[in-house]
UniProtKB/Swiss-Prot annotation:
Disulfide bonds: none annotated. Belongs to the argininosuccinate synthase family. Type 1 subfamily. This is Argininosuccinate synthase. Keywords: Amino-acid biosynthesis, Arginine biosynthesis, ATP-binding, Cytoplasm, Ligase, Nucleotide-binding. It comes from Anoxybacillus flavithermus (strain DSM 21510 / WK1). Homotetramer. ATP binds at residues 9-17, 116. Its main location: cytoplasm.
Length: 402
């Protein structure tokens, strides 16, 4: 009788490599699944490594464009920053990885899926809630959470089973990267008072070493979707990667954040998001030009909730779908070009234009070209201030001196 299959989210690192052998010992045939969401790894090597370690099959899926268009784009249009700082790098990729795990599990007739998360982080929640939403009949296995080994015990297990040990194992950092950015934790970063060492960064240049001349770029948007840089068209994934390089060269997008994790602890992390932060800033400026006041003032409430929902692993939820439906409605006229200066850690918007601009220079100007009806202000002020005036009249004699 054939062994039941389990589909493992495989990264090529020590944890998931050991997990292949461990799952085999539990009686499973392991199907490895590795997604390319822009992490910059040699994923063909990772695919082959899974087979060498013992997987019966290994999938390598190029999901960069799907990640960009279906996940990162929503974060961009929502200006999604958890606690006002974190651009949801890992939180955005987990639902897509979960989706692919479920798709392969159904294709392979697997009874379970597995991930390499510990019992301490947010990702275990994001994976398992997403998988439950997509296929409640699949069992979810978390080997690292179950085996409770120390790092030394895990390395010894790997040696005993001839599992290749990654050459970067001595690195003190825990890193996750995709198109939208790079997150880094552990090691010296666990001390919130310690300055991050320069080796903690990879996508961005230290301010001391950035160019002394700025780069001026123009980003073109169509209905809220970035399409061009300096007039040249790119796919969304390519555009984000281009901006990572352009803005990263100038040190844009470094974030040092102590955040409140979903599991109840605080965590200090360092993020690099040069492309994401540049796009969010440019997109917000174009919205300021094209959205009516009421929508512009209400949208940040939706944005904050979307960030929380994504961070908490509720991507496949009715609430997220409803929030995104509102978000998409706001993007119909967010078309135009934004000029950005990249210099010494800053993405500075210096100009914006749109065929749907609600800015009327003849109404805004203080020159002789002014077309604003100044006399209309008299009646407006009278009506606008009427509630305050009435309150003052009614309560004027009741005021108490302090």
């Amino acid at each position: 009788m054939a062994n039941p299959k389990v589909v493992l989210a495989y990264s090529g690192g020590l944890d998931t490599s050991v997990a292949i052998k461990w799952l085999q010992e539990q009686g499973y045939d392991v199907v490895a699944c590795c997604l390319d969401v822009g992490e910059g790894k040699d994923l063909e090597f990772v695919k082959e490594k899974a087979l060498k370690v013992g997987a019966v099959k290994s999938y390598m899926i190029d999901a960069k464009e799907e990640f960009a268009n279906e996940y990162a784009l929503i974060a961009l249009q929502a200006h999604a920053l958890y606690e006002g700082k974190y651009p949801l790098i890992s939180a955005l990729s987990r639902p897509l990885i979960s989706k692919k795990l479920v798709e392969i599990a159904e294709l392979e007739g697997a009874v379970a899926v597995a991930h390499g998360c510990t019992g301490k982080g947010n990702d275990q929640v994001r994976f398992e809630v997403s998988i439950q939403a997509l296929n409640p009949n699949l069992k979810v296995i978390a080997p690292v959470r179950e085996w409770k080994w120390s790092r030394e015990e895990e390395i010894e297990y790997a040696k005993q089973h001839d599992i290749p040990i990654p050459i970067d194992l001595d690195s003190p950092f825990s890193i996750d990267q995709n198109l939208w950015g790079r997150s880094n934790e552990c090691g010296i970063l666990e001390d919130p008072w310690a300055a991050p060492p320069e080796e903690a960064y990879e996508l961005t240049v230290a301010l001391e070493h950035t160019p002394n001349e700025p780069d001026i770029i123009e980003i073109g948007f169509e209905q809220g979707i970035p399409k061009t840089i300096n007039g040249k068209a790119y796919s969304l994934a390519e555009l984000i990667l281009q901006l990572n390089a352009l803005a990263g060269k100038h040190g844009v997008g470094r974030i040092d954040h102590v955040e409140n994790r979903l599991v109840g602890i605080k965590s200090r992390e360092v993020y690099e998001c040069p492309g994401a932060m540049t796009l969010i800033k440019a997109h917000k400026e174009l919205e300021d030009l094209t959205l009516v006041k009421e929508v512009a003032h209400f949208k940040p409430i939706i944005e904050q909730k979307i960030a929380e929902v994504i961070y908490n692993g509720l991507w496949f939820s009715p609430l997220k779908d409803a929030l995104v439906a509102f978000l998409k409605e706001t993007q119909k006229n967010v078309t135009g070009v934004v000029r950005v200066k990249l210099f010494k850690g800053h993405a500075i918007v210096e100009g914006r234009k749109s065929p749907f601009s609600l800015y009327d220079e003849k109404l805004a100007t203080y020159t002789a070209e002014d077309e604003f009806d100044h006399q209309a202000a008299v009646g407006f002020i009278s009506l606008f201030g009427l509630p305050t005036k009435v309150y003052s009249i009614v309560n004027g004699e009741k005021k108490v001196s302090v």
